[in-house]
Design a protein with these regions (language model features):
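Non-transmembrane, aqueous-exposed alpha-helical and coiled segments at domain scale
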Residues: 1-457
Length: 457
């Protein structure tokens, strides 16, 4: 293992410190928070998010609030700058072209690019794929990490040292930094992964120079694969994954993190590195990996995947914490906003089928379809709730990455690459228009105590 040669903390010391903490820190009862009107998790009692700001970037729609205050479930919509992602995905299909770069422009600037603007923008991103001179050696090769998200966050922070105007908060500078990060982050990811393979997995590593004229999806596949070969359909499907993950409103954990840091007046690299750190958390960015692992477990234990009764019974056991990883969660099901459907999941499910059947993933694809179809009824029976539960984007995204031969190490990093344009768009909006530091309040519930001189303790 590649760790600094420093002495470990004594287990007895750690136990002593833990006991000290437990002795002086009482449990924070959530019922007290409810009585005080605290919006835990910045959620309203009905599960909807607290209104914390306004934005022009995107809109996440999963329900309608009726005049009496109740919620009416509706089919989900995700709207980038006034355009539904369904429309963007359909346009990509209609003209058989890559759409992510156009979505990046749309999110950053607020309108669709002209043909000339689009061509110049793609060229601009293409010309900035390479990392600054010496960066790969100094910041990546000399300090590997077993976790690619950790390495990406550190790499982004390190970019501060290569930027003469790192703290400049003017619009031209923030846009310059944003475009550079959007272009360079895929290269950082693949380089970090190759080094991880060599140092931690004891496998061969290889580095490819970016190929001119490639889309972001093509660049990722060609730089990731040893032979640099991929099919147009594979690249198009990855491009679609990037498209549907590019933004998701201002209230999700990583985007809100970006806004909180941006409101303080800090630099772009600190804000985006913090967003990567937030996305690294398994409650936010790692669900598609858990879906894949759960899918393998289900296929291992269900003798007949086409038998709905057998599948239903195993899902019931998962909910009861009698099967799976013991969490009681059916990964890929349920969402904080969407009720009837997640438009991102609908898009990926439809577009993934052909490649799944072509590459021999028919059984996996069909099982995910069965989970989507059967799980809502099981939730209703087991939880005794009429609240609608739909499949979310993670249900099929992990399978797509698996079909593309992408390592599980890169599932969440790919999410980060897709989401950087959204983070940057929200950062620009926060810096240029908000102009007020985000500062919510916490109620102190601790004890009052008098100070004792140290010689009396």
């Amino acid at each position: 293992m590649y760790y600094p040669d420093v002495p470990a903390l004594d287990p007895e010391d750690i136990e002593l410190l833990c006991n000290e903490y437990i002795a002086h820190n009482k449990h924070l009862d959530p019922h007290i928070a409810d009585r005080l009107g605290v919006k835990r998790g910045l959620r309203n009692p009905d599960g909807t998010g607290v209104l914390a700001g306004i934005t022009n970037v995107s809109s996440v729609i999963g329900y309608e609030k009726l005049p009496e205050g109740t919620i009416r479930p509706i089919p989900g919509r995700l709207v980038y700058r006034g355009i539904d992602i369904d429309t963007l995905a359909a346009e990509a299909d209609k003209n058989d072209r890559f759409m992510f770069e156009e979505v990046v422009w749309l999110l950053l600037f607020g309108a669709l690019p002209t043909q000339e603007q689009y061509a110049r923008f793609c060229k601009l991103i293409d010309e900035h794929r390479e990392l600054p001179k010496g960066f790969a050696d100094d910041m990546i090769m000399n300090s590997p990490s077993p976790n690619i998200m950790n390495k990406m966050a550190r790499s982004v922070l390190s970019m501060y040292s290569y930027d003469e105007h790192a703290d400049d908060l003017s619009l031209p500078n923030i846009l310059t930094q944003s475009i550079n990060l959007i272009a360079e982050l895929p290269t950082m990811m693949v380089n970090a992964y190759q080094l991880k393979r060599r140092v931690y997995d004891h496998e061969s590593m290889y580095f490819h120079y970016p190929i001119a004229g490639q889309s972001t999806a093509e660049h990722i596949l060609s730089s990731y694969r040893a032979d640099q070969k991929f099919t147009h359909e594979e690249a198009r499907l990855l491009d679609l994954c990037l498209l549907v993950h590019a933004d998701h409103g201002g209230g999700n954990c990583s985007t809100f993190t970006t806004r909180v840091l941006s409101s303080s007046g800090t630099d772009t690299y600190s804000a985006i590195a913090a967003a990567i750190g937030a996305l690294k958390g398994p409650k936010h960015g790692g669900a598609n990996l858990m879906v894949n692992r759960q899918l393998k477990d289900i296929l291992k234990h269900v003798e007949n995947p086409e038998d709905d009764d057998e599948v239903r019974e195993y899902l019931r056991r998962i909910l009861r914490k009698q099967a799976g990883d013991g969490s009681g969660l059916i990964y890929g099901m349920g969402h904080a906003v969407y009720t009837i459907s997640d438009p991102r999941e609908v898009i990926l499910k439809q577009r993934a089928k052909h490649l799944a059947y072509e590459k021999g993933f028919e059984e996996e694809y069909n099982m995910l379809c069965s989970i989507e179809r059967l799980a809502p009824g099981i939730f209703a029976e087991e939880k005794g709730s009429s609240k609608p539960v739909c499949a979310n984007v993670d249900l099929f995204s992990g399978l797509i990455y698996n079909m593309l031969g992408i390592s599980e190490d890169l599932y969440t990093p790919l999410f980060a690459i897709a989401r950087v344009p959204g983070w940057c768009a929200h950062r620009v909006e926060e810096v240029i228009f908000a102009n007020r530091i985000i500062r919510p309040a916490y109620k102190y519930l601790g004890v009052r105590q008098k100070y004792k001189p140290i010689e009396e303790r």
